[in-house]
Amino acid sequence: MLKKLTVVMAASAAALMAATSAGMAQAKLKWAHVYETSEPFHTSSVWAAQEIGKRTNGRYAIDVYPASQLGKEADINQGLSLGSVDIIISGSSFAAKSFPPIGVTYYPYTFRDADHLLAYTKSDVFKDLTKGYEDKTGHHIVAVTYYGVRHTSSNRPIKVCADMKGLKMRVPDVPAYLAMPRACGANTAPIAFAEVYLALQNGTVEAQENPLTTIEAKKFYEVQKHIVLTGHIVDHLNTIISGELWKKLSEEDRKIFTDVMQEASAKATGEIKVNEAKLVDFFKQKGLTVTEINKDEFRDTVIKTTSFESFDYRKADWDRIQAVK
């Protein structure tokens, strides 16, 4: 009888210790972004959150907050330092507010195409720039997702740079995003991403710029007449882990987070490429006019009017990116 009691007590203690350990070990994390639930950036984030839970045996419970639920893009970047979010997806243009050199990728016509961008993410110059960001902020860029080539949508036809003169255009309040529109004479307005559709609809602005996939997902095509293939920025998003969380992760968990997030970014990148290829025909079917432009003319205008130093970029970094094959 005593032996049985001892066995039962030992088993109960072991179960209690296991339950306590599991309870103490599980961390609840917040992952935030500004994109719609239908977009690959969200679906891949949800997959990654679930996969991290599986691979860590439930030590992490990650909730994903899409569509600016935890704030605009500037807010969630600030949230990494405030501790209100643990993981975000965000462009290097926002990272550049803390470490300007990393924003050089947004200088218009830096990348030839998506493959050039993806090759850059495996280069030494990428490692140097992301390390500079981490040294400045403590936050760790763990993965990069292709966002798409940024083009212009407008209610005014645009065939040459000068056609943009006086155009009321929504552009994010990011110096490099502003470079091409301002070089061509547009009047820019920094309207929040969540408010762009209404601003286009009510005429507050006549135009905006984004990848084709975003123009489709946010339904901007419903309130625009023209798609102009300016192709001025080959854009990307960073998956960033807060410095506070990164410090707490064991080496084993760092590897799991990194592997899963890079797998997720590869999934989203693949989807974006496929979707992007279909959208020119989609917009034509919706009755929009799609216009090709001479990119050399636009690029030359930007280079003549916009210095790297004015953005606190380093031309040496840009030259290194140009050399990436």
Q: What is each of the regions a protein language model found here?
A:
Residues M1-M9:
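Bacterial N-terminal signal peptides that target proteins for export
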Residues M9-A18:
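Bacterial N-terminal signal peptides
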Residues A10-A11, M24-H116, V125-D128, G132-K325:
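N-terminal secretory/targeting leader peptides
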Residues M17-A25:
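Sec/Tat signal peptide C-region and signal peptidase I cleavage site
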